[in-house]
């Protein structure tokens, strides 16, 4: 199935997409109007669609669930809306893609509530505002079995 996502990265965003794909872990420090959220939402979508894993799981995590909804949910729906057989779960802020991939938007306000999840890829937005244990104690173990670069 040929899928066209309605997103054209700017020059520096295209560079980042390329570099992120070459590394296991990436940290981006970009100016306020760089387009980080749109860039990373589209990176998650592409990674989920191209994943060779069976039913891959991806997450976008911001400091709070409310922030994920207000900042990223509309973008997620906008950029996946034209993908045939895509399903949206408004309550859980989840997109189920036709290849079995799932992208969920999460909040880190109860980081212990994220323990035990499995992830193939993840984006943490506003990293300075999440609990310091989120990545080393919760997200890194969730990604430990995955070799996907995101």
Task: Please give the residue ranges for each predicted region.
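Phosphate/NTP-binding elements of NTP-utilizing enzymes
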Residues: 1-148
